[in-house]
Amino acid sequence: METKITIRFFGSLVDLAGRQYVHLDAGINQTIKDCVERLGVPHTEVYFITLQKSFVVFDKIVENGDMYFVYPECNLDIPKEYILTPKYEGVPKFILDIHLGKLARLLRMLGISAEYGIVDDDEIVSKALSENLIILTRDRGILKRNEVTYGYILRSDDPKIQLREVTLRYSLQNWFAPFTRCMECNGELISVSKQGVQEQLPEKVKETFDEFAKCERCGKVYWGGTHYENMSLFIEKFLKSISKKEF
């Protein structure tokens, strides 16, 4: 017995599915979650689903002739029991897959917690769950795991565009605190005296700078200079682009 259904995707989910309307031969005893993820849309991207103007949950078994509407996160007032992926509460904190090193550094530069460096997907998921982190990835497979709650599929492979994507998706501009995190390890930076870090400073730096910061986690020392000025200009340009929705 055939089970042909139609799924209509809305908003950002259209990018993931590749089209707005999909006609699918679902097969026997398939849930709407199975069908949505088969089309390339991880459950972490789905906020709610309707069938004939009624809300449904992920384990709804699809039936021949069904037409489902699938929505991304939005500000509509949805009954709590039908919110399929809850909104992340509090200051967004991330864990990135091993292919997103440049994005991790950009997020850290802006003061956003971005854990990075774990190769194994199982370990990424475990850390995300234990520390309530949002998984950022280009790999849809990791976000299709049932145990994963928070995650985002990056649409672009350009780190600067990825930064824009994540900023707009999670309103990160509300939490930007530039130069407060270590770009190497994600640790928090604290102000230190020149005397306290002299042994770690090149001679020219000792002669030129008086203000320093040190990573509480790895001990790396930071100071101003051309690199700092270039990053400051990048941040200024990026913030303007966010407000104008450009970049």
Annotate each language-model stretch with its function:
Residues 1-93:
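Ubiquitin-like/PB1-type beta-grasp interaction modules and other compact soluble beta-rich domains
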Residues 197-207, 230-241:
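Short cysteine/histidine-rich metal-coordination sites, predominantly Zn2+-binding motifs
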Residues 182-185, 215-218:
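Short cysteine-rich clusters marking metal-coordination/redox-active sites
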